[in-house]
Regions:
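N-terminal "arm"/small-domain region of PLP-dependent enzymes with the aminotransferase-like
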Residues: 1-76, 87, 91, 174, ...
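Conserved core of the PLP fold type I
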Residues: 67-196
Length: 196
């Protein structure tokens, strides 16, 4: 009888982020104007569209296109791109990094899959570690990223009322516990478009 592995079952199940992306995809296929408030870039900025279009035209040069399409880069990524990213961080932030400090992934979901699984779960010494999210609510896409069960830990926030119909979440530092069971702390605030 045909079976799939536990991993296959995990990646094949319905997830919160999968449902969110399906909803967005369905909405984008319907006629009429759609205002995107999350699940991607909420704004199309004309000046950036023009920059991207110009860069795509540069790539369409036959020699560059042929190299990009038919030649493998190193497993770490395109050497010129790695160097450029490192130089950007050196110049912009004064960070002393090299190409060896740059990781290229297929996007943020893929990057967080690697990061969360590198720092959580069972370790060679027999310990088990978790990823700490200092407060929830948090980005729904993290919920199904880890391969092992029971690897995420979070705390309820303090709620600061800032007006009649508005509030902010704040980390409850009094409740926060960080000990040897925490492999990494993940701090993000993906609340498009406000950044709250």
């Amino acid at each position: 009888m045909f079976q799939i592995s536990s991993f296959g079952k995990k990646i094949g199940k319905v997830t919160g982020i999968g449902e969110l992306m399906n909803d967005i995809g369905d909405a984008m296929q319907k006629p009429g104007e759609v205002i995107l408030m999350g699940g991607g870039n909420p704004a199309k900025i004309q000046e950036m569209q023009e920059v991207f279009h110009s860069l795509l035209n540069e790539v369409s040069d036959l020699n560059r296109f042929s190299k990009i399409i038919s030649s493998y880069d190193s497993p770490q990524g395109n050497e010129d791109f790695l160097q450029d990213v490192a130089k950007y961080f050196q110049r912009t932030f004064g960070w002393n990094i090299t190409r060896n400090n740059v990781a290229i992934t297929n996007g943020s979901q893929n990057a967080f899959f690697y990061l969360l699984n590198m720092f959580s779960g069972k370790f060679p010494d027999g310990s088990k570690k978790k990823i700490l999210f200092p407060m929830v609510p948090e980005y729904i896409g993290y919920a199904d990223q880890t391969l092992e069960e029971d690897t995420l830990r979070s705390y309820l926030p303090k709620i600061e009322y800032t007006g009649k119909h508005s509030f902010k979440y704040r980390v409850d530092f009094d409740a926060l516990k960080i000990d040897e069971s925490i492999g990494a702390i993940c701090v993000t605030r993906p609340t498009n478009p406000t950044g709250n």
